[in-house]
A protein has these predicted regions:
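A short, flexible loop at the N-terminus of ABC-type nucleotide-binding domains that lies
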Residues: 1-4, 8-21, 28
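The feature captures the beta-strand-to-loop junction immediately N-terminal to the Walker
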Residues: 35-37
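Helix-to-loop junction immediately C-terminal to a conserved catalytic motif
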Residues: 50
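Conserved ABC transporter NBD signature motif
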Residues: 58-69, 73-74
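ABC-family P-loop ATPase nucleotide-binding domains
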Residues: 80-137
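Catalytic Walker B motif of ABC-type/P-loop ATPase nucleotide-binding domains
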Residues: 150-154
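Short loop immediately C-terminal to the Walker-B catalytic DE motif
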Residues: 156-160
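ABC transporter nucleotide-binding domain
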Residues: 166-182, 186-247
């Protein structure tokens, strides 16, 4: 579905490249967590995928078509929700009327259901909303477009705890086998139970492109009290409960993935996983 081939991108000539000879392949039907430190290019990658930024070298292909060309048949299949955005001072119904023609598969039913799940009315004025409410409305519209590729940049920023729970429920309810959702975030605990594939970026390179299921077959994520033996740990760090650690998995008794612990481990030990990319 999505292929990035030998991509190099920098914002200005002479500046350090955000990506250099970067390649990635993704199939459809996953909720993907795009993780990394601030400044590693998570948002940049989403904009490159959407065709809103152009690489100096290499290609970003959606079903074999370069996204930077912005052909209508590609644009109607993808939607991006930026971290920060402005909505016009109009009603939601007018916003839908103006924008739905660009998305042939748009569904009013999905829009209304998502708004209900976010506890928002269907008939509302966009200018009267808080930033968190605007984010919920825009994500509801994004889901209603029924695009095959949905790009979300820091979607839980500005949401309170109940709203983050609503977000996870809304995304999971409207997933299909044909849809791919890429969520860029540094708030990993907000999406830990939602995603089924992990992309981790670190210093112009891809640390990992793997499913959470495969990761949990290979690795166990544990908390042990102070003083307990951790000689079997592949990686360990102090935690409030004692020690957070990763041990080798047996493929049978899987544990819940700890994305923050995994990221910290992989930045120090990139070979921690046997097959870190494109599983």
């Amino acid at each position: 579905m999505l292929d990035i081939k030998d991509l190099t991108f920098r914002y200005r000539a002479g500046r350090t490249a955000v990506f250099h000879n970067f390649s990635l392949h993704l199939e459809e039907g996953n909720i993907i967590g795009l993780l990394g430190k601030n400044g590693t290019g998570k948002s940049t990658l989403l904009y490159l995928i959407a065709g809103l930024l152009h690489p100096q070298q290499g290609k970003v292909l959606y079903k074999g078509i370069e996204t930077q060309i912005r052909r209508p048949e590609v644009q109607e299949e993808m939607f991006i929700v930026p971290e920060e955005f402005e909505l016009p001072n109009i009603s939601l119904s007018r916003f839908v009327e103006l924008n739905r023609p660009f998305y042939p598969k748009f569904s009013n039913d999905i829009l209304e259901q998502a708004l209900r799940d976010f506890e928002l009315p269907v008939d509302l004025q966009l200018e009267a909303l808080s930033m968190g409410q605007k984010k919920k409305v825009f994500m509801s519209f994004a889901l209603a477009t029924n695009t095959r590729l949905l790009l979300l940049d820091e979607p839980t920023n500005g949401l309170d705890i109940p709203s983050k729970t609503q977000f996870r429920r809304v995304i999971s309810q409207h997933m299909t086998d044909e849809r791919t959702v890429i969520i860029s975030t540094h708030q990993v605990h907000d999406v830990e139970t939602l995603i089924d594939r992990v992309l981790m970026l670190e210093g112009q390179r891809l640390l990992i492109n793997d499913t959470t299921a495969h990761i949990c077959e290979q690795l166990r994520f544990e908390q042990r009290p102070y003083g307990q033996d951790i000689s079997d740990a592949l990686y360990a760090e102090p935690s409030l409960a004692g020690t957070a650690l990763i041990t080798r998995g047996d493929g049978f008794q899987n544990t819940q993935i700890d994305l923050e612990l995994l990221f910290n481990a992989l930045t120090q030990h990139p070979d921690l996983l046997e097959t870190p990319q494109n599983v």
